[in-house]
Amino acid sequence: MPVWVASAARAALRALLGHPFEPNQQVVQPDGGEPLLVPVRSAARLSDDQALAISRCDPGPGLDLTRDLEIWVRVAWTPSADQGLVLMPGEGVGRIGAGGDACLSTYARQLLECTLLPLLPPGQGLEVEPVLPRGRSLAERTSNAAFGVVDGLALIGTQAEVQQSAAPEQLEQVLRELRALVADPGFGGSVALVIGENGLDLARRAGLSPLLKVGNWLGPVLVAAAEAGVKDLLLLGYHGKLIKLAGGIFHTHHHLADGRLEVLTALGLDVGLSLEELRHLRAAASVEDAFQRLNPETAMDLGRLLAATVEQRSQAYIARYGDWSLRIAAVLFDRSRTLRWRGPMAEERFFTLQD
């Protein structure tokens, strides 16, 4: 989605500058890649100091709830050039907590800066306000709330190309990236597999590297990493996703298998929860809700067992396909975006030096 936000923002800025409308806008990629030509629907000045443009999201083939999502972007001059770009979350754009800042990835901000700043006149700053008219209603069909994102959709893309996490083509792309990473002369034998955009953003903030973003095809990627000679692999993801691995589910798309609360309830039995507590877990609305129903000490014990079980089941999974020296570690984050639970291997191989 950030690509279409950037294209609409550029069209609006051009309108504000008095330039004629162009149906395709050049979006500059932060990594220096070939600029993208991204279509926009319309653009117009609203007054002497602000303009509006509209684009429509095209996520490519596959299922995506943002397909044909209309994106409005209003731009306006700011009083001071020192402010640079000022991002204002409009209606339908997710915020970090009620009244908080817009939820956007580093990539999304860099995309806007690379695309817009070269067009700004000297001494001029710009306010950018994306608006997603259907964002609030569509957000109810996502896991945004589980990460503390409220009021709309998060702008958390990390690349211009759309990835379909459940498609075979996505698996092939990840495997190509894995092979390239391992073939790099500077590769040191370890890699962090991150699940989803939130995981990727959090891993970067934690200073973990090298990183490889994966979708739902975790099993084949683990085996491929072992075959490629990776020695230490860290799985980093939201507890509601990685818990499936603790249940032996290694293709994690929700259309294929779930079982999250059942797995958590079984683990609760292992840590000695009472029958009443187990019933509360089984009746919870989500994994996050289940942990919230426990006292902090019990929740910590259960989370640590969950992380350890993810490590154990993942190790057992690759052992079915060969005898490799790969060590698999796991760290899980919760809705507060905190790396909350680490398995024993994660503590030993990835976090000892950081701590």
Curated annotation (Swiss-Prot):
Catalysed reaction equations from the record: Co-precorrin-5B + S-adenosyl-L-methionine = Co-precorrin-6A + S-adenosyl-L-homocysteine
**GO function term, MF aspect, one:** cobalt-precorrin-5B C1-methyltransferase activity
Which key words tag this protein in UniProt? Cobalamin biosynthesis, Methyltransferase, S-adenosyl-L-methionine, Transferase
Q: Does the keyword Transferase apply?
A: yes
Disulfide-bonded cysteine pairs: these are none
Q: In which pathway does it act?
A: Cofactor biosynthesis; adenosylcobalamin biosynthesis; cob(II)yrinate a,c-diamide from sirohydrochlorin (anaerobic route): step 6/10
Q: What is its EC number?
A: 2.1.1.195
Instruction: Please report which protein family the annotation says this sequence is part of.
Output: Belongs to the CbiD family.
Name of this chain's protein: Cobalt-precorrin-5B C(1)-methyltransferase
Which source organism?
Parasynechococcus marenigrum (strain WH8102)
Q: What is the lineage of its organism?
A: Bacteria, Bacillati, Cyanobacteriota, Cyanophyceae, Synechococcales
Gene of origin? cbiD
